[in-house]
């Protein structure tokens, strides 16, 4: 097994940089740079030197003996001054040593997974935590990283293994002292797991939206003030504004944190009949993105004139509050009048939806759980035929168990791992 190393902190100038090593030569390498009397596990303040004895930097050296480390291997970390030159000097020194190589993206975490220090959902949770931009995303990622989904899946798996064992007992030991009617307990176990799976499957879409972000489309006729409103919400000139109708022809996206939730605001082309080919393409795109959005804000005097059917959660506000005597339910992107109230309304709708989110956060999770649920449905149907078909019921249970094992990364995930770890930095 190679010993790997990489910069664990962000590239660039910083107060502190952390360089991580993992593998059989991690401790030996730490001693080469920091002195021979390092503890096998602990913290030391040392002067780091290269192979010629030249001083590299003063820093903190952390050592972790296997298996009590992040990767499950011997691990060492150098906490040094974060200048580009200092970091490069230490990395260059490590690269010149035999038996060491630069880590691939996510390789430290991959070793943690392979050594049983993390489950696949925890790896996904770590990736999401690194990418988290809002409080809701942080909390969601922390729950998965702390093992919430893995614990659920292991609990379901244990119940299904118990159910399968009961059926196998009837099949293999029918002539001995084994209860002949195990179906009540089996059905009870299936019902418990089935209810949990249905609940989690129902919450995946919203949970995934929290992970990736909600889309909120601003819709209205030309010159209603959509781009001005977008700029007001973004706090910058994200969209070009003009008195000329039809200025916006593409969909302009602005990412923002709205009450702790990740939201992408979409400024769309004004909806109207037009003979301009390019504007017409923009309007068609606007309609498609509006249909796909999680929430739509209609900024218009007359929604019916938009040719779009209102959905229950759609919001309708009147434009240009600064130019009308009655400002009820009206906003102005110029003065900001009514904008805070609109933001609160958007936030309330999305927070209400978010309350139904489950722990599972990805389409992969949903597919695995749906596969298990379908197998449980087939199991229940087969059980109706009595003990003669218990062998088929047991096989369906094994299908469900395998689906749950794929959920936590026990089987069939090699291609998926390559995709996940490609998104990690070298030091993770």
Swiss-Prot record:
Protein residues bound to GTP: 223-228, 242-248, 267-270
GO CC annotation terms, alphabetical: cytoplasm
UniProtKB keywords: Cytoplasm, GTP-binding, Hydrolase, Magnesium, Metal-binding, Nucleotide-binding, Potassium, tRNA processing
Enzyme Commission code: 3.6.-.-
Sequence positions that bind (6S)-5-formyl-5,6,7,8-tetrahydrofolate: 20, 77, 117, 428
HAMAP family hit by this protein: GTPase_MnmE
Name of the protein in its database record: tRNA modification GTPase MnmE
Lineage, uppermost ranks: Bacteria, Pseudomonadati, Pseudomonadota, Alphaproteobacteria, Rhodobacterales
